[in-house]
Amino acid sequence: MNLPKVFEEKMKDLLGSEYEAYTACYDEPRHYGLRVNTAKISVEDFLKIAPWPLEPVPWIHNGFYYDGDNIQPSKHPYYFAGLYYLQEPSAMTPADRLPVEPGDRVLDVCAAPGGKATELGAKLGGTGVLAANDLSSSRAKGLLKNLELFGIGNVLILSEEPGKLVSYFPEYFDKILIDAPCSGEGMFRKEKKMVKAW
């Protein structure tokens, strides 16, 4: 893959001797993942009805790999019922690792389109409060759609500058997730136009 020169130089400086291994990953097959919505169905019950073979993502209890070259889970009724979220396994990690407990007050600072927020809401199990924020009001609409589809309750949708949230909610939240908007490198294999746009 031909990467932008500025990007290559930045990554060489950042990664040093690991740069070659990093760039080699762009030539490897892409991994497709889905995360079971445990707010609606247990992992065990989903595996009983899963319409295709799934392989567990080793570090995510409700994450699975699927063969994205031959199946389209975004067209299955289970997708439209909110039983799973299509998400790269690496993107599942932040919400999985945040130690959310039922009853917590949780803020997802950069929440759209909802992959992390839906997992945080499932962990809350209808208790506590989830504040899902995204600076972009148009992206917040998609966030709302996904939270509704996933059956996540006790949620507040915000579209505010992150710096202002502290004045609205001083010392309120038990847990805060900031998976700041990315620069797009993860999309390089999915959409070649992202390489040019970087």
Where do the language-model regions lie?
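S-adenosylmethionine
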Residues: 1-198
